[in-house]
């Protein structure tokens, strides 16, 4: 009986060892280009944007959190706006030149024309379908706003009037992404399907997910769509057949954390943020992956990855965590001679 129990313990240890080996199959990056930025908040941060001045930017988040930087994102100071409630959730921020917008819940839209020195509230109709969760500044007095049920509106007069871009909403969404040329992809609240829309269409086009795994997030790649599914799976649409998908990949097997967001730094270099401080990178457009293990000890889920320019990027995590891309670290690592 004692012998049997001993063998059971040995077998259990072997299983754990094999699982650990499986977890570590992803090679480590040769360098870490990310630095942890200290922030004066533990609020949930949701979006980041910079003005025409690359040193001047804003972070937004829950509990009406608004942070400002004047040194490119190394240091941030909190700003307090004169709102009727401090429980507003600032979901999205966007700038075009000196003009900026903040969209939030419930039913909040803020506008600035002086690079964020002052903000005014734009009245929204009580009949607006859903709450604003995404805003894109497109030029002087021009912006596009989307709500959490997929209603899309555009203004060309600084927010005085808004024109609906779709005839009907798509339903409650968990994620919504806009491409540079004005296309949208939205993931349903439960991740059971996704919808697409592009300028000129009257309505959203629904699509069934292509596997049994629920969709976590989606966005636009260089020549199509990318998809992150539950269980740490990543997939790209077929560049030659837009309605079809390439084979799914699972960069790191036997893990309990999920993949949450993806962003391209260059046409070939793409970063994925995940739960529990996990950060993956591919330098060949998503064919192979490496893991940045230097940030594993950061106690946060990395749920938003943003590259405003190839040398200006950020990873947003929960509990007030922010990583800043260090282009000099990357350049140094790629130019160092081999030992």
Curated annotation (Swiss-Prot):
At the top level of its lineage, which domain of life is listed? Bacteria
- Its name, as the record gives it, is Photosystem II assembly lipoprotein Ycf48
The UniProt record lists lipidation (S-diacylglycerol cysteine) at 23
What is the annotated role of this protein in its UniProt record? A factor required for optimal assembly of photosystem II (PSII), acting in the early stages of PSII assembly. Also plays a role in replacement of photodamaged D1 (psbA). Assists YidC in synthesis of chlorophyll-binding proteins.
Q: Where is the lipid attached (N-palmitoyl cysteine)?
A: 23
Please provide the record's free-text comment about the domains of this protein.
A 7-bladed beta-propeller torus, about 55 by 55 Angstroms, with a depth of about 25 Angstroms and a central pore.
Membrane topology listed for this record: Lipid-anchor
Q: How does it assemble?
A: Part of early PSII assembly complexes which includes D1 (psbA) and PsbI; not found in mature PSII. Binds to the lumenal side of PSII complexes. Interacts with YidC.
């Amino acid at each position: 009986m004692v012998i049997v129990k001993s063998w059971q313990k040995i077998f259990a240890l072997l299983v754990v060892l094999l699982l650990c080996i499986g977890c570590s199959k992803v090679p480590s990056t040769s360098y870490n280009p990310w630095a942890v930025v200290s922030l004066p908040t533990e609020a949930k941060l949701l979006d980041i944007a910079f003005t025409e001045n690359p040193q001047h930017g804003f972070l937004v988040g829950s509990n009406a959190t608004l942070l400002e930087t004047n040194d490119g994102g190394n240091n941030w100071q909190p700003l307090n706006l004169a709102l009727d409630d401090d429980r507003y959730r600032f979901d999205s921020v966007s700038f075009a030149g000196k003009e900026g917008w903040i969209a939030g819940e419930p039913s909040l839209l803020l506008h600035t024309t002086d690079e964020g020195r002052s903000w005014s509230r734009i009245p929204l109709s009580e009949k607006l379908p859903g709450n604003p969760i995404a805003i894109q500044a497109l030029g002087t007095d021009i912006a596009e706003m989307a709500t959490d049920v997929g209603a899309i509106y555009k203004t060309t007069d600084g927010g005085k009037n808004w024109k609906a871009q779709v005839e009907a909403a798509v339903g409650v969404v968990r994620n919504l992404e806009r491409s540079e040329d004005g296309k949208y992809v939205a993931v349903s609240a439960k991740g059971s399907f996704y919808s697409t829309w592009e300028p000129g269409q009257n309505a959203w086009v629904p699509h069934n997910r292509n596997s049994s795994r629920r969709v976590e997030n989606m966005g636009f790649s260089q020549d199509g769509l990318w998809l992150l599914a539950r269980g740490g799976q990543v997939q790209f649409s077929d560049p030659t057949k837009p309605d079809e998908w390439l084979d799914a990949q699972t960069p790191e097997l036997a893990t309990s954390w999920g993949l949450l967001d993806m962003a391209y730094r260059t046409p070939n270099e793409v970063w994925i943020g995940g739960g529990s401080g996990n950060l993956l990178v591919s330098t060949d457009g998503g064919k192979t992956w490496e893991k940045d293990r230097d940030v594993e000890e950061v106690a946060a889920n990395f749920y938003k990855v943003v590259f405003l320019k190839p040398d200006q990027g950020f990873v947003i995590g929960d509990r007030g965590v922010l990583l800043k891309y260090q282009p000099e670290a990357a350049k140094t690592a790629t130019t160092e001679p081999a030992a």
